[in-house]
């Protein structure tokens, strides 16, 4: 960001480009390996488990994992299962893969760390950095009633009138919490 701004004191387009490329490499690396890993575990072929990615995060859809390993469980049991799988399987796998990337790139040490942020059962992405999730667990905090996580949508922008933000939140909640019936 700042290094690529010609008015920044330490402007250096080469460094800015190097930072951007290394970030892209690390996200693409983990997305590729997560897809391979989850396809192997679940027994699927070329299924894309990575729904979206950002500068420092990936979003996984794990319904096939849930369907295979805890199909007849309650919603609470499924959330507990996903939390445990994230802590005990997915995060260690990501650490291992980022250690491999650091070794391959001859880094002094691996600085890439990813941890689970939320467990959500529904989500809508409209564009990069613009999404809505119906969250059941956020960093270990469990909600009795799911909460909406809204990023980059007009409901979070101060330039959008409050009455419009409130109505948009109502509409989003209605879309995510009700069935077509």
Please tell me what each predicted stretch does:
Residues 59-181:
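C-terminal polymerase-core module
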Residues 1, 11-32:
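Conserved pre-motif C helix in the palm subdomain of viral-like polymerases
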Residues 7, 34, 38-42, 101-105:
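Long, hydrophobic, amphipathic alpha-helical segments used as structural scaffolds
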Residues 1-6, 49-64, 122-123:
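Core structural elements
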